[in-house]
């Protein structure tokens, strides 16, 4: 136990150093120096734009540059990824100019079991060039219609679980039960916080979902049963290293997107600490951390 605590303190120290720095090069240097395998990290760290729901697109882009993170799960919040085609085109141009990769959109909601409504969502994502739709609420009854558009557009659907309060999709295992016999491009976005709050083992869920895991929302909780206990990653009880190990074992190719929902008006200290901690964990596993997390 003492050895584990010492290691945890060591990694947290790396996160604290990162929190005190402001340039991308210095942020990358905050990861603990350990012997490496010489292999680049197979874990791609990204950001869920909901984190910056109180900030404009330009402000978010500036913050992402400071964080050394260029992978984005964008949501139609503020002006991050507007649904209006002309405004969306400008947003895409801004991200491209900043070398930010839009890899997913959402959470996107599907309140209507109607072709026109569902097609509009897929067209929106097609214009953005994303390969994954993080879906908040498709009903079991609407899934066959959604599946039709998945096949037409070749865009994957990752249903996002929302914990004990969600009547349909409490945990990834609830999602898996209903999609396991559908098109393989229909799967899960595992929100680790919401998953833990249902009493589901996050690591076991990753293994169970397997190839139907298309996106990850990372966060940490001081109490794994309490939604309001969110803290910076590394300051809570989330088994971050075990999560990364499970993803690597399963050859997960998607992004691990930090969704930092607290301190909406001042998220940067917690984000800086969280990314430094996660990079420190990966470095402690022997991986080379790339200069930019794409």
Model regions and ranges:
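Hydrophobic faces of well-ordered beta-strands that scaffold small-molecule active sites
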Residues: 43-48, 72-74, 102-107, 133-135, ...
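Short, mixed-charge, low-aromatic patches
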Residues: 45-50, 74-78, 99-103, 129-136, ...
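Conserved anion-binding
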Residues: 158-167, 174-176
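Structural motif corresponding to the early beta-alpha repeats
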Residues: 70-156, 166, 194
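Histidine-acidic metal/acid-base catalytic patches
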Residues: 2-44, 54-68, 124, 169-172, ...
